[in-house]
């Protein structure tokens, strides 16, 4: 850009699960229109991996990497998307949301969970992330602290503080919240 700031363009598609779009002007969307409209005027579409692939292919020339949002951690679906994109755009970088919305244990066993990221990396998903990881981690931590604090008082908090002190040697800096 004009300020010489590095920029990465990430194109995201939710077409795998989205059932509505705002208009019918894009030729890319036309094969997926159902012909029906919602009471609010939106257009119903056939959601699924094929529409997500279609969107990904449309985005590929204009983006640095492509993110296909998924409903479950599904290696077959991830491979189908990656293969379709790479067939026309070899080496195109892909992004994968290792989503906190997934019930990982419901869909994968422990070994599959442990190898999931390595497997999708082989497919070209080089940017892997967990949206809202901090939100979920923070909330369960404070919930557990509240339970323990109710039963044990300051002893519960003191144990957390000791963990913080012990982690300073590793680079943890939040012991001092006032600097």
Language-model region placement:
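Alpha/beta enzyme core
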Residues: 1-102, 106-129, 142-143, 147
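Conserved alpha/beta catalytic core and glycan-binding cleft of carbohydrate-active enzymes
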Residues: 110-179
């Amino acid at each position: 850009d004009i300020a010489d700031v590095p920029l990465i363009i990430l194109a995201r598609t939710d077409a795998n699960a989205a059932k509505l779009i705002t208009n019918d002007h894009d030729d890319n969307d036309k094969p997926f229109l159902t012909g029906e409209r919602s009471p609010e005027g939106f257009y119903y579409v056939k959601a699924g991996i094929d529409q997500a692939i279609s969107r990904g292919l449309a985005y590929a020339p204009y983006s640095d990497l492509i993110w296909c949002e998924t409903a479950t951690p599904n290696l077959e679906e991830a491979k189908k998307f990656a293969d379709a994109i790479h067939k026309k755009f070899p080496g195109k970088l892909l992004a994968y949301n290792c989503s906190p919305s997934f019930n990982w244990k419901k869909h994968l066993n422990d070994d599959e969970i442990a190898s999931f990221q390595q497997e999708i990396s082989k497919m070209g998903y080089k940017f892997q992330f967990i949206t809202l990881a901090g939100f979920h981690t923070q909330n369960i931590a404070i919930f557990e602290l509240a339970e323990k604090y109710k039963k044990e008082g300051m002893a519960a908090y003191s144990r957390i503080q000791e963990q913080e002190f012990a982690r300073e040697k590793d680079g943890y800096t939040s012991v001092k919240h006032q600097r």
